[in-house]
Amino acid sequence: MQNSLQVAQVIISALPYIQKFRNKIFVVKYGGSAQIDDTLKNDFVRDIALLQLVGCKVVVVHGGGKKINSYLDRLHIKSEFVDGLRVTDKEAMEIVEMVLSGNINKEITALLNKNGARAIGVSGKDANLLKARILNNGKYGFVGEIERVNTYVLNGLLENGLIPVVAPVATDDEANSYNINADLCASKIASALKAERVIFLTDTRGILDKDGNLISKLNEAHITALKEDGTINGGMIPKVDAALECVKNGVANAHILDGRLPHSLLLELFTDDGIGTMIKG
């Protein structure tokens, strides 16, 4: 009986958040270990299905770094990271697109549909969803930055009760393909849609200070200082830059969460304290 009462209390405590977030748009960047571990995969898709069930409009943008690394290693194709971004030559770009659009995207979409959600898998190439240009004059190879997001397509899918699952591959006006950093892709989509929240699932507890303690809230000034002293570095830089860009462009809050924690998405959104780092404008 006591356990049942506790369950009821948890549900009731989430009610204000459910009411607040109904019909709001959430963009979730899905990557890291949560994409590899079968238990975490199932937790994630059920969390997304629940968000849809309680009336949230959800867009999922996925990465695929671990699986891309695996395929590149198997094919003996070298790959390196510069400034937290994967340098992508033409040969690697073919593998990146195959893994993101053909493998991971369809797996996530199928799992969501299996668990009661209504999801549709798309690439940034579909219906000119994402138009890009080459980043930094080709410093990173076939890595692009998004210039335009086709919000008509995304809003149409959301209004019809679908969850767009977006593979971060885009083209330019000459139909050249580009690898888009998934964090920056999620940021651009969230900004274009004026989303309520954007959530980045990572393999850390959030943003940590030099002593390894979680920083629960940050603003631009704090972020600048932490980047200058090296606290924020490596692969966390594009995540933080992506989060900051969102809140500058009208997204209410950005969240960086530990995707290794079961149901971290629900804990962050539907509890008073949250469990990650929230970035505010």
From Swiss-Prot:
Annotated CDD domains: AAK_NAGK-C
Enzyme Commission number(s): 2.7.2.8
Presence of the UniProt keyword tRNA processing in the record: no
Pathway given in the UniProt record: Amino-acid biosynthesis; L-arginine biosynthesis; N(2)-acetyl-L-ornithine from L-glutamate: step 2/4
Assigned keywords, A-Z: Amino-acid biosynthesis, Arginine biosynthesis, ATP-binding, Cytoplasm, Kinase, Nucleotide-binding, Transferase
Cellular location(s): Cytoplasm
Site feature: Transition state stabilizer: K29, K239
Family: Belongs to the acetylglutamate kinase family. ArgB subfamily.
Name this protein carries in UniProt: Acetylglutamate kinase
